[in-house]
């Protein structure tokens, strides 16, 4: 066969895609060909242009020569070196909910007693609780962060900067009040009682609940096994969310509770500074009123890929907390759903 004709046939091979995402379509033409290779090489050499997940064709969280190699291989052979990623494995005991044609998984979490906050040998990151005993009733929590696809199904809009794959990217650039509106609308559509996780529920789930192995991060002591995060060498090319569920799950089967996007919790700004407090049962803190809602702060958990400094890992520990104004909507703020007792 003529080599030129063979090359043209290879460039027209079926595309790997899910939703609106076309893997390897760097230039947005809806086809994958040599022009995408050229565009990707340009991005790698210059670090120019806004990052989108479509540039990370091998799903390793970086955009570099390895992605160029993989894309060239696909253009020439029609086969990806790294298999297509279509979503995480869902625990067998998860419950599936559907709204406007979009399904998502919630995991029942058996209640129990645990020590919440940082221990005696752990770094006391500002804003974190001192260690204290908490007992929780059973609840349910999202297996993954809320995706853009689910947000779109509920709200009809998508505030996220990178919308290259709405089915697998977490929604981001959302304030606490944006998320509250989303939850209220979701409850109207389903007749159920979804909510944010409480501060204590979030930490218990991140630690692995009654199956906890005592890890520093959600599922491992090795942050790279379970979290997309940033250090002092981070650049704007790493300040973006990754597909949900690419990293290892924690003991319960929950993904990305360390890193990726920071997750809003229900509680108002509060902190336990002294370990000598009475044991707590199902704690949740909400002020009855505040003088200025714009200055109100709610708890945020998990860290993200934007938390870049020499101690960026610290933001991603199971006990680390932040207190953020309720109308702030940073590009790596997201959420995870819960259902309370």
Language model: regions and residue ranges:
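Cellulosome-associated attachment modules in secreted, modular CAZymes
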Residues: 5-86, 159-163
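Residues that flank catalytic or metal-binding motifs in active/ligand-binding sites
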Residues: 22, 53, 102-105, 110, ...
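Bulky hydrophobic/aromatic "packing anchor" residues in well-ordered structure
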Residues: 26, 109, 114-116, 141, ...
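Acidic glycine-/aspartate-rich tracts in secreted/extracellular proteins
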Residues: 45-49, 77, 112, 119-121, ...
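GGW-centered surface loops in extracellular recognition modules
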Residues: 85-111, 115
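Short aromatic-cysteine micro-motif
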Residues: 101-102, 124-210, 233-256, 341
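Surface-exposed recognition segments
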Residues: 122-132, 210, 257-341
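Active-site Gly/Thr loop motif
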Residues: 219-252, 301-333
